[in-house]
């Protein structure tokens, strides 16, 4: 393979995956508005072998270094050579907006002024099994909450140091905790941001006992809405109308 084609192959692979994520997040936003459940839509389209299930999970946006960097590299390279990208620009725009979906849901539930409210964050890294917080959704979510007067308590198995010394070092309204349960104490709601394995099957009785209000915002659609409703939780997902959640 020639050098130009090899470079394009690398950029295109990551841009394609980023596109799948943003596309599914776009669909999730439509689902919320028309009364559909994006989780069911995902299962339906994924059963088509031409599509499959890889990278079609809705969420609160992609981060890290590779996807953002390579999408931006293709956009810039195209511009340098006289071509204006359209799909890739939209991929970036959707991803930017998706990181604001959870804060908007919080505001819809608790109001624009979050003074006196505390939110427990599960997960800081842009994905599980890393301490990498580059362009992580948690940064946007936390900053959007604290600028409205909220306090945030955060827990991540690996990324706490990165948050403290770099990505959230100037945010004085963030408290870091040492476990997924201690972070919940006296919080008005829990927000799942990173789908770490240890968050997949938590003790919901313990969660309910520690939270002020049994309210969960799930940025990765990890939990079962009907089960949580039966346990007395208010549960807000990505791509599912709050009416369906209830």
Residue ranges of predicted features:
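Structural/interface elements that position substrates and couple domains in central-metabolism enzymes
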Residues: 1-246
């Amino acid at each position: 393979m020639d050098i130009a084609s090899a470079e394009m192959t690398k950029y295109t692979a990551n841009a394609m995956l980023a596109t799948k994520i943003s596309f599914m997040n776009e669909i999730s936003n439509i689902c919320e508005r028309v009364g559909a459940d994006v989780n069911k839509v995902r299962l339906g389209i994924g059963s088509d072998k031409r599509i499959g299930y890889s990278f079609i999970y809705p969420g609160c946006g992609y981060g890290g270094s590779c996807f953002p960097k390579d999408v931006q590299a293709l956009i810039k390279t195209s511009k340098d050579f006289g071509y204006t990208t359209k799909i890739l620009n939209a991929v970036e725009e959707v991803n930017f907006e998706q990181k604001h979906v959870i804060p908007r849901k919080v505001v819809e539930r608790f109001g624009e002024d979050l003074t006196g409210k505390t939110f427990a964050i599960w997960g800081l890294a842009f994905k599980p099994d890393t301490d990498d917080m580059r362009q992580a959704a948690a940064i946007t979510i936390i900053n959007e909450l604290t600028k409205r007067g909220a306090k945030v308590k955060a827990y991540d198995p690996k990324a706490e140091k990165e948050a403290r010394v770099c990505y959230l070092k100037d945010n004085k309204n963030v408290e870091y905790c040492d476990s997924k349960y201690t972070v919940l104490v006296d919080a008005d709601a829990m927000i799942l941001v990173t789908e770490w394995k240890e968050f997949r099957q938590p003790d919901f009785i313990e969660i309910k006992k520690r939270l002020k209000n049994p309210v969960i915002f799930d940025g990765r659609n990890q939990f079962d809405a009907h089960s949580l409703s039966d346990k007395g939780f208010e549960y807000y997902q990505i791509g599912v109308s709050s009416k369906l959640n209830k």
